[in-house]
Amino acid sequence: MRYTMILSVLILFAGCAATRSPTAGPAREALMNGYSTARVDFGIVVSDIDKAAQFYKNALGLVEVEGFDVPADMGRNSGLSDNQPFHVRVFKVADDENATQVKIMQFKGAPGKRVDNTFIHSSFGIRYLTFYVQDIAAAAERVRRAGGTVIANGPVELPKELAPGVFLAVVRDPDGNMVELVGPKKQ
């Protein structure tokens, strides 16, 4: 009898474990809201794709993964471009299927117009990307060594009540887009 009871409990737990969703917390919530993943990717149109690629690889330390081509008719039919074909170069923080992708592309035959990137309030739209780093001082130094600029007085410490011991540095990519680096200073 005791053996049967223990076996029944084990079978019940095994059944519960088998039906449990593999995702939990915010990721599970995102999937419950109709999304297929909790990941968000970004596309950035640049004026010089090679220069931008060097910045995202060398200054930010992203990993370039396989890119892809978008044919003219796909660009037109999807509303992404006015019948312009384009190549997309893809970068990630890590070569991991769940890592956010930063996708850069250039339109040599139809160059875009620059927006005012002086401050985040200077134009509407997506104003900056945020990367969370392990050491803000090392990340800022990597940007400087790669020829980039940390703007204003960064890195600056966030208010202690918001995030004690966490710093913020804002840098610009070659087209002036803001990239925010957030993390602690290692001693």
Give the label of every model feature segment.
Residues 92, 105, 172, 182-183:
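Residue-level detector of conserved, well-ordered beta-strand and adjacent loop positions
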Residues 46-50, 65-66, 97-100, 106-178:
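Vicinal oxygen chelate
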Residues 13-18, 178:
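A broad helix-preferring feature
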Residues 17-53, 65-70, 74-80, 125-131, ...:
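N-terminal beta-strand motif that seeds the catalytic metal site of vicinal oxygen chelate
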Residues 34, 45-99, 145, 162-164, ...:
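Core segments of cupin and vicinal oxygen chelate
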Residues 4-15:
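Bacterial N-terminal signal peptides
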